[in-house]
Regions:
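Active-site loop/oxyanion-hole signature of alpha/beta-hydrolase fold enzymes
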Residues: 3-15, 40-48, 52-98
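Helix-rich cap/lid subdomain of alpha/beta-hydrolase
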Residues: 118-153
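Short beta-strand element of the alpha/beta-hydrolase
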Residues: 22-31
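Active-site glycine-rich loops that stabilize anionic/oxyanionic intermediates
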Residues: 31-34, 97
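A general structural signal for well-ordered alpha-helical segments in protein cores
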Residues: 26, 76, 100, 129, ...
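Alpha/beta-hydrolase active-site loop signature
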Residues: 33, 58-62, 124
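Conserved hydrolase catalytic core segment
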Residues: 89-127
Length: 153
């Protein structure tokens, strides 16, 4: 499903069922560098068991337009904008990894919109190496190499 948020096209998987804003809704939020694909099995299960689901691609990820948002606060606000754009009245948010931080931020900023949170594989905010951050902001692919070296030792 594609829809607009802040004049940018957003992609969300609906688990193989049409989205219905009148059903109980769940928004699944992926981690950094990932996409809606993280949630393929979960969205399908809940979509076929009475829920409307959206596994969104954050801006700059997957099939969603726009540059990546710079802060967790901006991303939490963006999730609220997704809620408003789709007409959902109250939603359960599910986050993985950085998606945990984003969903917690959304719930903190907009508690009247969020019914519940489910957090998987979350962690606290990590300090970033300034050199790595600089390379990533410039779009230098060396940033990916550095992250992979760190991740795989």
């Amino acid at each position: 499903m594609k829809f607009k948020v802040n004049n940018k096209e957003v992609f969300a998987s609906t688990g193989g069922r049409p989205f219905d804003k009148n059903k109980p809704a769940i928004i699944f939020v992926h981690g950094s560098g990932l996409s809606h694909i993280t949630w393929v099995l979960q969205t399908r299960y809940f979509a076929f068991h009475g829920y409307s689901v959206l596994a969104i691609d954050l801006p700059g990820h997957g099939y969603s337009e726009g540059p990546s948002l710079k802060s967790i606060e901006e991303q939490g606000k963006w999730i609220s904008d997704v809620i408003d754009s789709t007409g959902i009245k109250e939603v359960s948010l599910v986050g993985h990894s950085q998606g945990c931080l984003i969903t917690m931020e959304c719930a903190a900023q907009f508690p009247n919109k969020v019914k519940s949170l489910s957090l998987m594989g979350g962690a606290g905010a990590m300090p970033m190496n300034p050199e790595l951050l600089d390379l990533a902001e410039k779009g230098d692919l060396k940033a990916v190499d550095l992250m992979m070296d760190w991740a795989h030792g």
